[in-house]
Amino acid sequence: MKKGFMLFTLLAAFSGFAQADDAAIQQTLAKMGIKSSDIQPAPVAGMKTVLTNSGVLYITDDGKHIIQGPMYDVSGTAPVNVTNKMLLKQLNALEKEMIVYKAPQEKHVITVFTDITCGYCHKLHEQMADYNALGITVRYLAFPRQGLDSDAEKEMKAIWCAKDKNKAFDDVMAGKSVAPASCDVDIADHYALGVQLGVSGTPAVVLSNGTLVPGYQPPKEMKEFLDEHQKMTSGK
């Protein structure tokens, strides 16, 4: 009982120290008008990572200097986006909400931020059978380019809330309509994560290690790129 009390006291004290350490950072964020944020350790000493709905920031412990954008680890044979690697936890947390087209003989998994009003997103989806045949599993998340209150967002909400999400997505991409629907899926979560990962247009492809590949690539070129990328980053 005594040991349990001591452990609780130590944890409470540590939590208090952490909040005190972040006080300068929180003050700076408040001054910048950033209300919703998650402060985490950074891969560089003397800094913290701040996750916001507008992207990822790196801020010094004293709150005086801020860097916006991805951070790269260049110690290996190829640069690694450590910012997006950190965000993989949030990405995987949305796995149950993804619309997945699984390859029969899976070799690679890509997550695609898509928009039903995007021409190249349609082109990518039309070639889904080819991606799958090459061993590429495609997982979709929604990224309405016109914003969260747009018609596209509402239609994508209906797709993601449909009983058969894959059929609903196929139908809409083929020019058909989908019945309005509501559920617990929040497209804003998809969109916010996309922004944090650096998505600014669609389609945007996120690899299994967090690397962001903007734009459309045909199936064969995508397969070649994924194979080469896997070789370069193996062991990272």
Swiss-Prot record:
InterPro entries given for it?
Answer: DiS-bond_Isoase_DsbC/G, DiS-bond_isomerase_DsbC/G_N, DiS-bond_isomerase_DsbC/G_N_sf, Thiol:disulfide_interchange, Thioredoxin-like_fold, Thioredoxin-like_sf, Thioredoxin_CS, Thioredoxin_domain
Q: Which UniProt keywords apply?
A: Disulfide bond, Periplasm, Redox-active center, Signal
Reported effect, C121A: Partial loss of activity
Would you kindly state one Gene Ontology biological process term found in this protein's UniProt entry? Answer: chaperone-mediated protein folding
Record-annotated Thioredoxin domain positions? 36-231
**This protein's GO CC annotations:** outer membrane-bounded periplasmic space; periplasmic space
Q: Which residues form the signal peptide?
A: 1-20
Tell me what happens on changing C121V: Loss of activity
SUPFAM superfamilies per the UniProt record, alphabetical: DsbC/DsbG N-terminal domain-like, Thioredoxin-like
Q: Which GO terms describe its molecular function?
A: protein disulfide isomerase activity; protein homodimerization activity; protein-disulfide reductase activity
Q: Does the entry annotate any disulfide bonds, and if so which pairs?
A: C118-C121, C161-C183
Changing C183L has the effect of:
Destabilization of protein
This chain's function reads: Acts as a disulfide isomerase, interacting with incorrectly folded proteins to correct non-native disulfide bonds. DsbG and DsbC are part of a periplasmic reducing system that controls the level of cysteine sulfenylation, and provides reducing equivalents to rescue oxidatively damaged secreted proteins. Acts by transferring its disulfide bond to other proteins and is reduced in the process. DsbC is reoxidized by DsbD.
The record's family statement is:
Belongs to the thioredoxin family. DsbC subfamily.
Partners and quaternary state? Homodimer.
What name does UniProt use for this protein?
Answer: Thiol:disulfide interchange protein DsbC
From what organism does this protein derive? Answer: Escherichia coli (strain K12)
